[in-house]
Design a protein with these regions (language model features):
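Mid-to-C-terminal functional-domain signal that highlights helix-capping/loop sites
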Residues: 1-122
Length: 122
């Protein structure tokens, strides 16, 4: 019904977002952009992060990257920076690389996220 229906436009009260709370900073990401790109690399509050939505839109993940320069992309079911590959658990696929740090990420309505994170970036 009306209370649970999602608004497919961006940044409307009932639009979906992917939200992260890093303590000193929280940020909401437009769900439509995430669906379109699959991967968003960002640096909120100088913390390098990557948010991933799987192609079937059933898996949402966030990771802290090792450096700002490291940019992750999604290939099949693997994240890669062109040098190292990572599983969606954040684990490095080879022993010469360090694993990524998993971050909590939330799929919420925009109005709900901004209510509980009033200073959120977007």
């Amino acid at each position: 019904g009306r209370l649970t229906r999602r608004d497919t436009a961006s940044w409307q009260d009932k639009s979906w977002i992917a939200g992260i709370d890093l303590g000193e900073v929280s940020k909401a990401y437009d769900w439509n952009e995430l669906v379109s790109k699959g991967v968003i690399n960002d640096t909120p509050g100088s913390i390098p992060i990557t948010i991933v939505l799987t192609p079937d839109q059933k898996g949402l993940f966030a990771f802290r990257r090792h450096t700002v320069e490291q940019q992750l992309t999604f290939r099949n079911d693997t994240l890669t920076d062109g040098t190292a590959d990572y599983a969606l658990t954040g684990g490095a696929m080879d022993t010469s690389s360090s694993s990524l740090y998993i971050l909590p990420v939330y799929q919420e309505y925009w109005h709900s996220w901004r209510t509980f994170h009033p200073h959120t970036l977007r």
